[in-house]
């Protein structure tokens, strides 16, 4: 099926910043679009998000990226077969000519890459997850629900970026989603009773000013119990420390103090002994590989240790981490690497080497639910896409509810 047109426009994401929406048209009349997300806490080695840097939108306009789609990319890709995803992505990579898409912009390339996949699925009349994953795409992921926000995702006193709950003790996705929605509402009541703000952060979680980074966990434990669920058995806790944001001159600064890597690791060990923590993401900075070795040696057999800024969905960096025995899981963000093909290659490398994969949104999102299908397609087993609040977050959960009706299996207790 031949691609007859490719074009893009500048639209707004959930933070009110511009982003790229790309469209792909086919000879059978199919027209598909996709919107690119954007992160606030970003790894230094992520693919380049091309911004205009002029007066429009405080420098964050994306008209250059849009123009690249409408001209350079369209000239190269129009006329190609939409079902040749790898060839199309490789052609855009070659066209850009850099490792990090610094010429065309990863936001331009990814928008087209996503729209191509969606157009192909629509043309065939099959779900996106089935097109990308084939017959083996049948696992609904366990979500990480970010219900208290801190760090770069909220203007508050909390250093850790995300405090999440994971519903394990449920037979189906819809029951797991209901449980977390109830926990979220009970959390709101508890925060109100304690006199804390219930304003929400970028990802839909509450963003109160709390005294330290343990208090959110204590309050979440109360909310789990108040909602009628059992911590540790039905609901577990996950943290995203985003420690690169706290790293200064070889040490970590939080709660007005400085910590060495070893001291921060000991703090995590104590938290894991005290609370039912399943996962810690970016527990140390992306450049602190020696610290990561120590963290992995200490906790890899007890919890999930996720590299986000550490690996930036990059196959080469992940391979180095595997060789050095660093972390045991990877966060998967397509816009960190720039194309659907490259994302899939990274996931396959991780899975072959026993690393868990977590499909992830960004803090700047849209109503596009692509990653919900992508998580099922790649059998990642876990997905991270915010709280049960804000429609750009719920768009992904609602899409997973739709997929649940199509003979899929929820991992639940099986992780």
UniProtKB/Swiss-Prot annotation:
CDD domains tied to this protein: enolase
Active site: 203, 333
Keyword Magnesium in annotation: yes
UniProt enzyme class: lyase
Cofactor: Mg(2+)
Localization of this protein: Cytoplasm; Secreted; Cell surface
Known EC number: 4.2.1.11
Catalyzed reactions: (2R)-2-phosphoglycerate = phosphoenolpyruvate + H2O
Binding positions (Mg(2+)): 240, 281, 308
Chief location category: cytoplasm
Keywords assigned: Cytoplasm, Glycolysis, Lyase, Magnesium, Metal-binding, Secreted
Magnesium among keywords: yes
Residues the record lists as binding (2R)-2-phosphoglycerate: 161, 333, 362-363, 384
Gene Ontology biological-process entries: glycolytic process
Xref: InterPro entries: Enolase, Enolase-like_C_sf, Enolase-like_N, Enolase_C, Enolase_CS, Enolase_N
Pathway(s): Carbohydrate degradation; glycolysis; pyruvate from D-glyceraldehyde 3-phosphate: step 4/5
Any one annotated GO CC term: extracellular region
Molecular function GO terms recorded: magnesium ion binding; phosphopyruvate hydratase activity
Free-text remark on how the cofactor is bound: Binds a second Mg(2+) ion via substrate during catalysis.
Function, in words: Catalyzes the reversible conversion of 2-phosphoglycerate (2-PG) into phosphoenolpyruvate (PEP). It is essential for the degradation of carbohydrates via glycolysis.
HAMAP family (alphabetical): Enolase
PANTHER family: ENOLASE (PTHR11902:SF1)
Membership in a protein family: Belongs to the enolase family.
Name of the protein: Enolase
Organism: Campylobacter hominis (strain ATCC BAA-381 / DSM 21671 / CCUG 45161 / LMG 19568 / NCTC 13146 / CH001A)
